[in-house]
């Protein structure tokens, strides 16, 4: 029997700027390249667990915007059940701006967006599956 993993966490669209070094206050530097990727610790954990053959219940919250629609399709493509992917009409999908140096150092600015609206009320929706889960994973980046 495969373990069932319940993941409660964030989903962010990451804007990753590869830079030669961290810049100083007031200084502008040019990025060597820019990559847009789907990320967020919660989503990464859910997708990796699914790829390892586990049954995954992933609760997150996306905005109803272009990024949210794209992210939803990405999660479905990765085999994540959309039943627990909630949507917020007022807030955009979470985003993170990641500065990544050639030495592998990073600085991250995160805007939680819809992730920040995940609530205790939303968690009550999971009441039917809490007992089924063998493992519970949370990142403590959401306000629940």
Regions found by a protein language model. Give the residues of each.
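Ribokinase/PfkB-type carbohydrate-kinase core domain
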Residues: 1-11, 57, 61, 72-87, ...
């Amino acid at each position: 029997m495969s373990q069932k993993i319940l993941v409660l966490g964030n989903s962010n669209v990451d804007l990753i700027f590869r830079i030669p070094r961290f810049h100083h206050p007031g200084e502008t530097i040019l990025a060597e390249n820019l990559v847009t990727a789907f990320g967020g610790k919660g989503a990464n954990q859910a997708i990796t667990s699914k790829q390892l053959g586990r049954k995954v219940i992933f609760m997150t919250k996306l905005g109803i915007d272009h990024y949210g629609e794209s992210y939803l399709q990405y999660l479905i493509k990765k085999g994540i059940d959309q039943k627990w992917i909630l949507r917020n009409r007022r807030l955009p999908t979470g985003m993170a701006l990641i500065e990544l140096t050639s030495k592998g150092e990073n600085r991250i600015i995160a805007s939680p967006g819809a992730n920040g609206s995940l609530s205790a009320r939303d968690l009550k929706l999971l009441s039917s599956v809490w007992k089924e889960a063998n493992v519970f994973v949370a990142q403590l980046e959401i306000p629940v």
